[in-house]
């Protein structure tokens, strides 16, 4: 599933687009995300995103700008993790569902980004992986006293160390079904705010 916001060039030379690539997973067993205490640098939050190859150098150049780093689209939530799993690790089919969902959604985002260059219609394409699930979500992390805590959450960012995206981290937004409506609204606003900065010559469509 995909949802996107597009900005077209008035001269007809293609478009810029922010596209949310969404993988939906139904599972009754809880998912546990393992918390990460230190955020990655502001420039890395921008640069380590999935974009079409011919726009990658532009994204790297933009990553050093503070006005780009401060955009909500590139912000990481306080609830951020470096790994996740289902409580029983495997479902009845023997599949690690959270891992499979992460792999599927990142591969889909990379494939869409590459296709934009093949079709030669996109000047700037940004693909953001999102996993939506009805599985109860929990964050497991150390508190300031060094004690292990477990708490229920609705939305988190997964900084997944897997090379499939071509970056040190694949940044994936994890959203519980109950938070989907609120997230959808903010995601639309975030995309609308960033597009004029990514592609100042275009017009929103």
Give short role names for the model-derived ranges.
Residues 3-205:
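Intrinsically disordered, low-complexity Ser/Thr/Pro/Gly-rich regulatory segments
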């Amino acid at each position: 599933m995909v949802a996107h916001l597009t900005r077209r060039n008035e001269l007809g030379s293609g478009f810029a687009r922010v596209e949310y690539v969404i993988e939906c997973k139904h599972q009754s067993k809880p998912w546990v995300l393992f918390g990460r205490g230190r955020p990655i640098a502001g420039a890395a939050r921008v640069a380590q995103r999935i974009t079409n190859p011919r726009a990658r150098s532009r994204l790297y150049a933009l990553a050093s700008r503070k006005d780009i780093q401060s955009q909500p689209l590139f912000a990481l939530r306080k609830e951020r993790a470096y790994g996740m799993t289902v409580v029983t690790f495997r479902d009845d089919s023997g599949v690690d569902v959270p891992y499979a969902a992460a792999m599927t959604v990142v591969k889909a985002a990379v494939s869409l980004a590459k296709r934009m260059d093949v079709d030669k219609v996109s000047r700037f394409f940004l693909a953001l992986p999102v996993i939506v699930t009805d599985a109860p979500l929990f964050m497991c992390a150390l508190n300031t006293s060094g004690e292990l805590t477990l708490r229920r959450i609705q939305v988190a960012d997964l900084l997944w160390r897997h090379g499939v995206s071509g970056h040190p981290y694949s940044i994936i937004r994890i959203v519980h079904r109950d938070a989907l409506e609120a997230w959808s609204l903010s995601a639309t606003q975030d995309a609308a705010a960033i597009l004029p900065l990514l592609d100042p010559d275009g017009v929103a469509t």
